[in-house]
Amino acid sequence: MDGMDELIYKEVAAALRSSINQLPPANRVAAAGFDEAAMDRLITIASAYGTPTIYCTYEFAVKMIPHEAWRYTEAMKNELWNNGRLATYKGTKVIILEQGFEDETNTRKVIDPGYAWVIPTGADGKPVKIAFEGGTIVDEFNNYDRSREIQVYKKVGVVCMLANNICAYVDTSLLGQMYTWNYDGVTGKVITYDGRLDGTV
């Protein structure tokens, strides 16, 4: 049943993406790159309902750093050097959503790195609802070549109900970058930092 956990994780990520339009316009921001003032505004909105926490992927978190170098303390420099990101953003805790891959080739990610969610703790209810229905059905089949095949079926549903206490930040420069190493699925090559197709995977 390990695959069930991965499936639910994938369904939760898809449900969060598709439900972003439930949020009021003031609660969502789309920008190319990280806009410090916009994130501060979202944190202010979410903090009206509780202590805000930022949920994002590692790729998003490494961009959430102050732009002015004079704001870096020695502790921040050490944390950036050791972890590649800050554990808190202006006092707001940053939780990293674990990134997974769709299969054993490690080329396509499960979670879109372009999204960050600001969710207040202590708010009423949880934004994601997961429901299981019925028992687990296990069927075993004997194939013509005498091999056995086992199929497992479990009915599950995932829905997001976002209220006005939740905020979303969309980094359009990361949005949709689901392939690792900027892998080009058509040519089978890797896109380099300057846009060239180079090498094979």
Q: Which residues make up each language-model segment?
A:
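Long, positively charged binding patches that form subdomain-scale interaction surfaces
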Residues: 27-106
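Intrinsic-disorder/low-complexity coil detector
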Residues: 23-24, 51, 65, 112, ...
